[in-house]
Amino acid sequence: MGREFELKYGATPDILAVIRTEFGGFSPISMETTYFDTHSGALSTKRMTLRLRKENGTAVCTLKTPGDDLGRGEWEVLCDDIQKAIPLLLEAGCPEELNTLAATGIKPVCGTRFTRLIRDILLPGGRAELALDQGVLTGGGREAPLCEIEVECKEGPEAATAAFAQKLAARYNLIPEERSKFRRAIDLTRGEENG
């Protein structure tokens, strides 16, 4: 099983600009994501996220499942078709439940379009990725601004990543973002997001 450990913070364009200048060395990635669910919303109900994301034109299909604390299950495969990706995700070790739920049919429900600026941060015994995301959430024929910071553990102890993220949050007065991009985009689809 893949495991993802990350911390997210809401931000403003001004804060992103300051961090970009102070840290330097960022590389841009153009991201366009489509999130999928069953017609009954079963994946969302089970807090599972199924997406197809184009990262600088490369298609990556991902399943995320609930986990403990700030971690969660994550499986990714290179594929440009979500239906073809499901058996590949199963081969990669994702829960068989995906196959059962998706057998009833899946549909696109919401999405995102944003630019991600990434930079590696060397930490004691490991490495984190600092990501600055700016763009839009899409859903229900509406758009809402997206501006956030992610700190993801890439290797080494999660505690080192958490400590770096906490220092970053304190330095720039960042507020933790409890909801995923998917959750905010699906709320927008349902008319529950006020931007």
Where in this protein do the model-derived segments appear?
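Phosphate-end processing signature that detects enzymes handling 5′-triphosphorylated RNA
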Residues: M1-G195
